[in-house]
Amino acid sequence: MQPTTLTLPLQHLQLPFFDDAHRAFAPVLARWAAAQHIDESDDRQACRDWVRALGAGGWLRYCVPAGFGGALPQLDSRALVILRETLAFHSPLADFAFAMQGLGSGAITLAGTSEQRTQ
């Protein structure tokens, strides 16, 4: 990933459906994303590297509720939107890697069997 000199616009976080937690969360994530230097010349390896980095950074914990090791008591669609928007701003591949992790884990925690949820 090439470091960006652009600054992610965050004015929209003043909209009433975002709360103070979202407003505090977004710049932390933006700083983290800007600090990642993942070589994306091999997209398959870069996806693995992004998943590792997202996991190590704790960002994948937003894909499941706290009862399953997640960051928040329940899935927060607004936090997920901020995550995806911010990652995509810095690297579309980072957003893709995050989305692929969340698609399965989020659905399983919402509608999976007890056995699936414990895995």
Region roles according to the model:
Residues 6-8, 34, 59-64:
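Short acidic (Asp/Glu) and glycine-rich catalytic loops that position anionic groups and cofactors
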Residues 25, 31-32, 112-116:
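Long, well-ordered alpha-helical segments
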Residues 57-118:
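Internal helix-loop-helix
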Residues 18, 43-47, 117:
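Residue-level recognition of alpha-helical structural elements
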Residues 27-58, 68-72:
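Short secondary-structure junction/hinge motifs that connect adjacent elements
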Residues 1-25:
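Intrinsic disorder at enzyme termini
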Residues 6-8, 43, 52, 99-100:
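Short hydrophobic/aromatic segments of transmembrane alpha-helices and their interfaces
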